[in-house]
Amino acid sequence: MKSFRIILIVLLSYLFVGSVYASEGKGLEIATEVDIRDRGFGDTTSTMTMTLFDQYGNSTSRKIRNRTLEGTDEGDLSLVIFDTPADVKGTAFLSHTKKSGSDDQWLYLPALKRVKRIASSNQAGPFMGSEFAYEDISSQELEKYTYKYLRNEDYQGLDCFVVEYDPIDRKSGYSKQIVWIDTKEYRSHKIEFYDRKESLLKTLVYKNYSIYNGKFWRADIFEMENHQTGKKTILEFDDWKFQTGLSAKDFNKKSLKKVR
């Protein structure tokens, strides 16, 4: 009888390990397909309205321009330029995303007339007072996470994979992200962010998807809600343009002060 129990425990252990490997394999497969479907966009530009809501519902808005260049050997390059209001006009944020480790990020502050490097230890902090962290602004490279497929689930009438993304970088402000990805177009619709104590921190919802150049899906609205503070930030995108001729020289930290 004792031998039978030992055999049963061993068999159950093999089944558990097998299910974990299957979950991780399917999670990586889904995340890889998400990545593949967005390859080849080249570069993009867009305009954006960022609206910040405090816990009482009071709001302030900012007008922003965005530029992104698709990466080859490393991750994407992105540039964010603030146009209004006057107190942030001319502020520019530059990110060179890395496929492993922390990203290279710089912030130009016109009031100080200097470019400030964002230390890797500070990339979990809030971006320009919003509910988005600096690490949220960078492109989400495939190599930055390990993955676990959790289940299939309906989300607003769409059949979705639910996948856990676990950051490899220990300096990330998140212990994990739970992502809802539709099974037809492989678009992200919702992300739950958990803090380092495994508590739900924020939820990001993507709305109003449109397709460009017959292939590239972009959501026009990002809503990030902070469950621990009651604050919220909404990003509304407009005027998407693809393959505009941007190059790496347009994403140089030395020229941040001259960005127009």
PLM regions with names:
Residues V259-R260:
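Short, solvent-exposed mixed-charge patches
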